[in-house]
Regions:
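Non-catalytic DNA-recognition/assembly elements of restriction-modification systems
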Residues: 1-45, 176-184, 188-216
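DNA target-recognition patches
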Residues: 33, 43-78
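Short, solvent-exposed loop/turn positions at domain surfaces
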Residues: 72, 78-79, 110, 156
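A short beta-sheet element
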Residues: 81-83, 87-141
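A short glycine-rich beta-alpha junction/loop motif
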Residues: 114-122, 154-181
Length: 216
């Protein structure tokens, strides 16, 4: 069984968009670098060094496609030596074994709209009217995508990485933005349902613990 929460979406992705590794696509083939802005440059930021921004180290991104932790740091402490990103950007772990394990997520709720994080992330920024962050996340979390990327890593031992050039030149069938948004809606709805179920299970466990406590 797939331990990943994303496992539910693999078949949905294939059904809607086909095998992303196939060159026989129903949609026009594009370089991934044409479908998103890869590792966008940091703009001039009107923040003081004491202003807070969100900080996301590698451990804050789970292997099932979610942010599990995010802290606030003073901009002056993290403005150098870290990766820059914004809300709705997609993070892709480029180093082994994080890449093979599926680390990646869409970033939301950044303090002052700015995030800084590990240099071992590639950042994929969706282009308005061309790509959805949920399609980009789903594509880059597909096991077949990661397996192909693993074969194209450079470096040695525990320092192997997926290059920005590899992602830039990866050929993929680009679905119409309407189809991507339909996939996004399905993804969000299923995610919301899982959240409700998880909260209900926690509530039931709490009740059960209380009742057992009374018996004891």
């Amino acid at each position: 069984a797939d331990k990943s929460k994303f496992g539910d979406f693999k078949s949905q992705f294939i059904e809607m968009f086909g095998n992303p590794l196939s060159l026989n696509q129903k949609n026009e083939l594009k370089r991934l670098g044409e479908c998103c802005i890869l590792n966008p440059r940091r703009p001039n930021i009107a923040l003081c060094d004491t202003d807070k921004v969100s900080f996301i180290p590698m451990p804050a991104v789970s292997e099932d496609g979610y942010l599990v932790d995010m802290t606030d740091e003073e901009y002056g402490k993290v403005k150098k030596g870290f990766t820059y990103f914004e809300n709705n950007d997609v993070l892709f772990a480029k180093i082994t074994p994080c890449m093979e394990n599926g680390k990646g997520a869409i970033v939301h709720g950044l303090t002052n709209g700015i995030g800084m994080g590990s240099t071992e992330f590639h950042v994929l920024r969706p282009i308005n009217g061309i790509s959805s962050p949920y399609w980009l996340l789903a594509l880059t979390r597909m096991p077949i995508f990661r397996e192909r990327a693993a074969k194209n890593m450079s470096g040695t031992g525990g320092q192997k990485r997926v290059s920005a050039s590899y992602l830039d030149h990866f050929m993929v069938g680009l679905p119409a933005i309407e189809e991507q948004r339909r996939f996004e809606a399905i993804y969000k709805q299923a995610d919301k349902s899982k959240s409700v179920i998880q909260k209900a299970l926690v509530y039931l466990n709490d009740i059960q613990s209380d009742e057992l406590g009374k018996i004891a």
